[in-house]
């Protein structure tokens, strides 16, 4: 468990802090006239930063502030419908989620209709029966008394589809790690096919970046549907088809309505089981101008395998203990569905494995807190708080609340969310740089519980989420890019950096 605090770095923001710092004033006196000239020069802001970091020599030699800014791109693709809205705007969140779900449902229906026979051959016809039940195409009487059987079929189907995807991508990962002379003909063909997709993704990103100004944070790469769909499935389930009906694992699983029937009949919400269509590490490699060797591309592929395996482990965790609990609930009602069953197995929405967003009751526009909860089987969480008024960030690993999804006792490691939130508030208002009015509002907020603003799904592994967060805490170059623009923009950029990471080229 860990706890870290830091000041965010905004270009030019260090000048005021440095000039008013007693320690800095002593440094200036010791440095003499040379430093005074630098401080008074046009690059004063960069010079002050250089003094505090011990790099005044580079400033004196003429390095300017603009040179610190490079092209920064959020490692996400617009066409994948996974953008992060303003964390403090629930209305915007709701609209984006609804639009994304409508577009995704249309895409999933096309995939199921096109690859109907192949899905039956590979995963079994019983999964298509579940889809018909959920779409109202089958009579309700077919489900009565067989609810538990359908739940088990859906969970087994999810696991089978997930493991099939893991096996396919793992074969590609291992093939990329194998010496070229030792590869089989199938491995060579698999790598050749994936290289074609990767090069198409790489070229599309290069064209997109050419239109991006060097001093802008590109919110997201806007690529064509053809590039996204083909690159999203590293090793095709059934082989490539027309661009608008490429059968991705995510589309098959969503189109079969497996999560929906589990939620409807048991109250078990599995909406957090999502994998990025194109993993941020693959986008990062595609952004590089040089040719990517097989071993480096293999490590990017491995990142996606880790997410898939994490989701499969979570499905197994739900299947083993939760099915026993569900069966007991059904036995209480003669093995038939009853409206009380889902409510008995529901957990509080703030305890689900997502990124939960909070703000303070006062000065809400300047402060937001994210509580990131790991999949249920990991029993982990962390909190990261941002105070944009004083450019302060606070991180702490936190314990999770015990509930029915954990399937037993919960090990308590570290403090709870409320204690971590209180320390963040205490630390923020007690900083010497905190304006008096902001300090009063933070003190007032300290006595109240934070306001819940909603949640967002993350599509990378929990470990990757922690890694993204640590970069936000320590990487000053990244912070300068994330904190540019009016207040609304930094909030959205920070959320995107947390969920997907940002590449500073």
UniProtKB/Swiss-Prot annotation:
Its main location: virion. One of its GO terms (cellular component) is viral outer capsid. GO terms for molecular function: structural molecule activity. Residues 1-42 are annotated as: Involved in membrane permeabilization. Pfam families: Orbi_VP5. Keywords: Capsid protein, Outer capsid protein, Viral penetration into host cytoplasm, Viral penetration via permeabilization of host membrane, Virion, Virus entry into host cell. This is Outer capsid protein VP5. The gene is Segment-6.
């Amino acid at each position: 468990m860990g706890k870290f605090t830091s000041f965010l770095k905004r270009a030019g923001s260090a000048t005021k802090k440095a000039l008013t710092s007693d320690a800095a004033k002593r440094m200036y006196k010791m440095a003499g006239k040379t430093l005074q000239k630098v401080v008074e020069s046009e690059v004063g802001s960069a010079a002050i930063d250089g003094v505090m970091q011990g790099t005044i020599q580079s400033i004196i030699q003429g390095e300017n502030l603009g040179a610190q800014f490079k092209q920064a791109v959020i490692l996400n693709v617009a066409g994948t419908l996974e953008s992060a809205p303003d964390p403090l705007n629930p209305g915007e969140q709701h609209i984006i989620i609804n639009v994304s779900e409508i577009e995704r449902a249309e895409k999933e229906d096309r995939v199921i209709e096109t690859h109907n026979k192949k899905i039956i051959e590979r995963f079994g016809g019983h999964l298509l029966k579940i889809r018909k039940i959920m779409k109202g195409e089958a009579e309700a009487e077919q489900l009565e008394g067989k609810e538990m059987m359908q739940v088990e079929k859906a969970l087994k189907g999810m696991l089978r589809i997930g493991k099939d995807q893991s096996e396919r991508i793992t074969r590609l990962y291992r093939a990329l790690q194998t010496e070229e002379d030792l590869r089989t003909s199938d491995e060579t063909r698999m790598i050749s096919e994936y290289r074609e997709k990767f090069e198409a993704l790489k070229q599309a990103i290069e064209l997109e970046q050419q239109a991006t100004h060097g001093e802008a944070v590109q919110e997201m790469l806007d690529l064509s549907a053809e590039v996204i769909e083909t690159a999203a499935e590293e090793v095709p389930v059934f082989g490539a088809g027309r661009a608008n009906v490429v059968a991705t694992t995510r589309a098959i699983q969503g189109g079969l309505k497996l999560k929906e029937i589990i939620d409807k009949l048991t109250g078990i919400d599995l909406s957090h089981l999502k994998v990025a269509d194109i993993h941020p590490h693959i986008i990062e490699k595609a952004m590089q101008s040089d040719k990517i060797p097989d071993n480096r591309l293999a490590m990017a592929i491995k990142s996606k395998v880790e997410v898939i395996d994490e989701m499969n482990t979570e499905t197994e965790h739900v299947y083993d203990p939760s099915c026993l609990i569900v069966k007991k609930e059904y036995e209480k009602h003669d093995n038939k569905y009853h409206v009380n069953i889902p409510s008995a197995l529901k957990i509080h929405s703030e305890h689900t494995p997502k990124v939960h967003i909070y703000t303070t009751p006062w000065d809400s526009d300047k402060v937001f807190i994210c509580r990131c909860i790991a999949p249920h089987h990991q029993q982990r969480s962390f909190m990261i708080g941002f105070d944009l008024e004083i450019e302060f960030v606070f991180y702490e690993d936190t314990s999770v609340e015990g509930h029915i999804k954990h399937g037993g006792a919960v090990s308590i490691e570290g403090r709870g969310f409320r204690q971590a939130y209180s320390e963040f508030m205490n630390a923020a208002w007690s900083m010497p740089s905190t304006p008096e009015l902001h300090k009063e509002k933070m003190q007032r907020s300290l006595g109240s519980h934070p306001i819940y603003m909603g949640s967002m799904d993350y599509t990378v592994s929990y470990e990757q989420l922690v890694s993204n967060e640590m970069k936000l805490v320590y990487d000053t170059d990244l912070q300068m890019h994330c904190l540019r623009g009016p207040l609304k923009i930094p909030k959205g950029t920070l959320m995107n950096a947390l969920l997907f990471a940002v590449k500073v080229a």
